[in-house]
Regions:
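Amphipathic alpha-helical assembly segments used for oligomerization, scaffolding, or translocation
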Residues: 1-200
Length: 200
């Protein structure tokens, strides 16, 4: 009898260990999926923050065509997972690959749209003068122009960085507006007589 009792206890322990091992594997599989989704969540959150900042500062944003479709896929995946919280629920068939492909497409299209929206806004609403080298080529080399050109170069260097790297805060937008105003305010001496221009 003692042997039967020991065997029964051993079987029960083995069953508990098996359940623990299966639970550990399931937890590992779910963690892997969570990490993958967290990367998309970080990207989407960053784009949402920059979109909100753009909107607050008057940048017109284009609609992203895949947004509603992707939201629906995420919602369906969540509902399925809440009914059966296992990694296999998410990975069944092509659900996971379809979901991640939609998220990747959404992130890519949103980045492209925001970049284009920023480029248009920058060109339409900020200083549109010539780069310093081109501006210098049109000026007589008077002391006044040299001083103005030096200031122009300094401001333009800080200003032009925003063309490809949009502001990331309200303070950056304020700085950009100030740079644009300062560049616009710089006046060059352009009415130099031709004889003086040749001499300089």
């Amino acid at each position: 009898m003692a042997l039967l009792a020991d065997a029964t206890k051993t079987c029960e322990r083995l069953q508990i260990l098996r359940t623990i091992a299966e639970g550990a594997e399931e937890a590992k599989a779910i963690e892997s999926l969570r990490v993958e989704l967290a990367e998309f969540a970080t990207s989407v959150n960053g784009l949402a923050c920059s979109g909100a900042l753009f909107h607050e500062n008057g940048v017109s944003l284009s609609a992203v065509s895949d947004l509603a479709n992707t939201q629906e896929s995420v919602q369906k995946s969540l509902e399925r997972f809440l009914k059966a919280p296992k990694a296999t629920t998410l990975r069944q068939g092509t659900r996971w690959t379809t979901l991640t492909a939609k998220l990747e497409t959404l992130v890519d299209k949103t980045k492209v749209a925001q970049s284009g929206d920023w480029q248009r806004h920058f060109e339409q609403h900020f200083f549109g003068g010539l780069p310093p080298a081109k501006r210098e080529a049109t000026l007589a080399k008077t002391p006044e122009n040299e001083r103005a050109l030096k200031r122009y170069r300094e401001l333009y260097q800080s200003f032009i960085q925003y063309r490809t790297k949009p502001p990331t805060s309200a303070e950056d937008f304020q700085k950009l507006h100030l740079l644009s105003q300062q560049l616009t305010a710089i006046k060059f001496q352009e009415d130099v007589p031709e004889a003086v221009r040749k001499f300089l």
